[in-house]
C-alpha cells in the first residue's frame, strides 16, 4: 500500500483571500489536466476514441462537481469558462442565483480548499491511504454531519465502490455520530494512560437502537450525562416491554449484572419502592423537584450497569 496523502489542518487553512484565489487557480489547472488527459487518451486509443461526455464521467472535475453539489443543498458548482472579455468565470450558484467566488462563506471555501489538494494527487491507482486531520474545522454543525460522507464519495468510483482507505481524526460529535452510523466505517478512540496512547474500538451497533449525541459524547469523549443515562433506561424499557418504571427497576434488580453493594439504592414515590441506583437517578432527573441528588461517580456507575444489561 502507498500512503497517498497526509493532510493536516495546518497545511491550507488559515487563508486570506489571495490564498483562496490561488486555490481556485489550482482548480482551473485541474480542468486543464482533464482536457490534456482526454486528448492524450484519444491519441493512445485512436482506433476507439471517447467522446468528451464519456471521458468526463471519470474526470477529476466531475468528481469535484458531484461531491460538492451533493454536499451543499442550496448551492451548486456548474463549471468554468470565460466571458466575452476573456475574464475567467467559476460557476457557482446559491439559491438559484449565480455568485462570485468572494461571496462564498468560510465553510464553503474550506470545502474547496480541502478538496483541491486531494484531487491533485488523485490517480487511478487503488488501495491508497488518505489521512485527514479535523475535517470538520470551521464548518456549521449540519455540515460537520455531512463531511464524513463527502470525503467517502470523493474517493468512490462510478460503480459505487470506495477505492481508497481514509483515516480521519475528529473531535466533532456531529461528525462522529455519522461515522458511527456507517457500518463500513471503523471508529477508534485514542486514550492517554499515563503518557501511553491506547486504541479502543467503538463497536457497531452501540447500546441504543439509534446513535445519539449523548452516546457519542460518552463512548468517544467519556462525558457522562443525564440525557444518556435516561436514554439507556428507556432502551431497557423498550427492549423488554417494561412500560412501568417499577417493572424496569425490578428487571434491573434481578439481572445477573446487578451487584448489591454497588448498584442498590433505595428510594420511593408514594407507596412504590425502588431498589436500584438506575431508577433512583432516573427519577431524580425526571422529577428534579424531589430533592434527590447524585454524584458524577454514581451517574457513571449506573450508566455502566445499564450498558452491561444491554450488551
Regions found by a protein language model. Give the residues of each.
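Switch/communication elements of ASCE P-loop NTPase nucleotide-binding domains
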Residues: 1, 86-211
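Extended helical coiled-coil dimerization/tether regions that scaffold
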Residues: 9-129, 159, 269-272, 276-281, ...
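Low-complexity, flexible helical/coil segments
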Residues: 36-46, 169, 203-206, 223-228
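Phosphate-binding active sites in nucleotide-utilizing proteins
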Residues: 1-7
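Generic structural signal for hydrophobic residues
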Residues: 64-68, 147, 212
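RecA-like P-loop NTPase motor core
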Residues: 153-161, 174-311
Amino acid at each position: 500500500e502507498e500512503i497517498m496523502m497526509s493532510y493536516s489542518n495546518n497545511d491550507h487553512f488559515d487563508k486570506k483571500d489571495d490564498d483562496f484565489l490561488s486555490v481556485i487557480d489550482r482548480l482551473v489547472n485541474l480542468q486543464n489536466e482533464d482536457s490534456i488527459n482526454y486528448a492524450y487518451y484519444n491519441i493512445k486509443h485512436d482506433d476507439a476514441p471517447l467522446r468528451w461526455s464519456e471521458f468526463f464521467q471519470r474526470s477529476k472535475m466531475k468528481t469535484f462537481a458531484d461531491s460538492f453539489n451533493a454536499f451543499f443543498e442550496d448551492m451548486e458548482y456548474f463549471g468554468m469558462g470565460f466571458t466575452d472579455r476573456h475574464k475567467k468565470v467559476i460557476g457557482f450558484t446559491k439559491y438559484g442565483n449565480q455568485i462570485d467566488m468572494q461571496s462564498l462563506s468560510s465553510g464553503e471555501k474550506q470545502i474547496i480548499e480541502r478538496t483541491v489538494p486531494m484531487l491533485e494527487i488523485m490517480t487511478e491507482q487503488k488501495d491508497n491511504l488518505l489521512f485527514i486531520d479535523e475535517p470538520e474545522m470551521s464548518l456549521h454543525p449540519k455540515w460537520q454531519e455531512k463531511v464524513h460522507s463527502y470525503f467517502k464519495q470523493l474517493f468512490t468510483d462510478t460503480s459505487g465502490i470506495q477505492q481508497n482507505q481514509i483515516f480521519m481524526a475528529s473531535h466533532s460529535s456531529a461528525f462522529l455520530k455519522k461515522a458511527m452510523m456507517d457500518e463500513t466505517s471503523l471508529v477508534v478512540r485514542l486514550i492517554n494512560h499515563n503518557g501511553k496512547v491506547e486504541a479502543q474500538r467503538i463497536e457497531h451497533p452501540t447500546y441504543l437502537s439509534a446513535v445519539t449525541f449523548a452516546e457519542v459524547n460518552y463512548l468517544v469523549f467519556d462525558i457522562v450525562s443525564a440525557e444518556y443515562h435516561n436514554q439507556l433506561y428507556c432502551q431497557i424499557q423498550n427492549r423488554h416491554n417494561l412500560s412501568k418504571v417499577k417493572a424496569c427497576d425490578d428487571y434491573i434488580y434481578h439481572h445477573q449484572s446487578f451487584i448489591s453493594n454497588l448498584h442498590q439504592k433505595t428510594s420511593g414515590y408514594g407507596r412504590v419502592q425502588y431498589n436500584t441506583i438506575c431508577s433512583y437517578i432516573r427519577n431524580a432527573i425526571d422529577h428534579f423537584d424531589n430533592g434527590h441528588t447524585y454524584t458524577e461517580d454514581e451517574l457513571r456507575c449506573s450508566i455502566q450497569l445499564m450498558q452491561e444489561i444491554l450488551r
